[in-house]
Amino acid sequence: MNTFAPLMVQGTTSDAGKTVLVAGLCRVLSNKGIQVAPFKPQNMALNSAVTEDGGEIGRAQALQADAARVKPHVHMNPILLKPNTDIGAQVIVQGKAIETMDAWGFQDYKKLAMPYVLESFAYLNDHYQCVVVEGAGSPAEINLRENDIANMGFAEAADVPVIIVADIDRGGVFAHLYGTLALLSESEQARVKGFVINRFRGDISLLVPGLEWLEEKTGKPVLGVIPYLHGLNLEAEDAIKSEQQEKGQFVVKVPVVTRISNHTDFDSLRLHPDIDLQFVGKGQSLSGADFIILPGSKSVQADLNYLRSQGWDKDIERHLRFGGKVMGICGGYQMLGEQLSDPLGIEGEPSLIDGLGHLAISTELKKQKQLTLVEGELHLPNQSSAKVKGYEIHAGVSIHTAGAHLPVIINSESIVRYDGALNHEGSIFGTYLHGIFDEPEAFEAIMSWAGLKESKAIDMKEIQEEAIERIAASIEESLDLSQLWPSLFEKKAAY
């Protein structure tokens, strides 16, 4: 298909705004009636999403697909790295986990990964009119340039034009842009179409002399300056978002384990006006919570040991003695059980450790992951049956022992199965379902069970949609997009 030229967005640093800029450009093009798809050759993240065909990609690419108004697909993020130690990560290729590699092992593997990356890019080119590509980190990382598949290595191999974005809010924006360009090869410099400055606050007339200097020194145009957009409630790709517009009275505490995954599960709580969501870090206590939720984890056994080292297991026991409620999601659910077994060494050395012992389940880690989008019903004590939707990403298989109550009924392709566990007293609930709080009925049932009565869920889809449209409007107003797609946009002043 490929009617319009693809574009790659690279950044001078991590968190320069690449993910949001790609999402915004996808929405701008979609609003023009263009069939557009996002693409990220290589992503490193613990927040992942499940595609309809049972593959796994970065959640950022799923968000960008939403912005493009298309369904997420494994080819949108062919290489996903999910760190499970400080020097190692699980490598996922076109949606499927292949093995865990250390940093040096992956450096060697990259030359083998490029064909998969180019195959996925070709698939998107064949099925969409335009592809907007996101780089990773910075293209100027000298130590990572050999066999690069994430930035200029891909752009050169696929012959894709590039724009470079920098975050002026961090300071040093001209050094970042000038220095990044200077560290590229001549052929790489030639494919850079221009610069974008992101997150600007203040009087732009004060910035103009610097923009003119940059254009003169580099010979590259500044395509525009995007203002700082306050209150954008989009999922965070890496760092946990903790800011709240307003804090409620009902305190929910989440212990931050070392390999916390899919912390976007808690965005519905963080943004709710009745809830004070607190992420509890090293050396802090879980005491004072109305509700405790154990999050997902990429290294469940190691994080369970860390949880104990912080004394959080004792905080949980005390919380339960005083009538509090506890919930576990995915890895947190496994921790609440009786045993955790890793006979194949999926997370390191083969091992068997005791869980917290609050739920009548035992979990064994398997090589094959469960990757599924699910819908069903949630049945909690003293609550009406609630619709539930979510997704499963886990290697563990949990076996229910005597006395386990199964609170989630999943209807999948005419097959009824069960998920989760509830203790005999009805005070502890565990589930494998990520995204469970994003379904309003499930949110209201869980929070009512936990003690927050008659509180209505917020509409996360509407919040995300509003944020994406704000970004798209700002991009279209701020950038001279005619320099990227002249047949679609009229020329305008960039600043």
Swiss-Prot record:
Keyword Phosphoprotein found: no
CDD domains: CobQ_N, GATase1_CobQ
Disulfide feature: none
Pathway annotation from the record: Cofactor biosynthesis; adenosylcobalamin biosynthesis
Keywords: Cobalamin biosynthesis, Glutamine amidotransferase
The GATase cobBQ-type domain, residue ranges: 249-442
Taxonomic superkingdom: Bacteria
GO MF annotation, one: ABC-type vitamin B12 transporter activity
InterPro entries named among the record's database cross-references: Class_I_gatase-like, CobQ/CobB/MinD/ParA_Nub-bd_dom, CobQ_GATase1, CobQ_N, CobQ_synth, GATase_3, P-loop_NTPase
Classification via Pfam families: CbiA (PF01656), GATase_3 (PF07685)
Active site: C330, H434
Entry's Gene Ontology BP terms: cobalamin biosynthetic process
Coiled coil stretches, renumbered: none
Keyword Thylakoid attached: no
Protein family membership: Belongs to the CobB/CobQ family. CobQ subfamily.
Function noted in UniProt: Catalyzes amidations at positions B, D, E, and G on adenosylcobyrinic A,C-diamide. NH(2) groups are provided by glutamine, and one molecule of ATP is hydrogenolyzed for each amidation.
The protein, known as: Cobyric acid synthase
Naturally occurring in which organism (per UniProt): Aliivibrio salmonicida (strain LFI1238)
This protein's encoding gene: cobQ
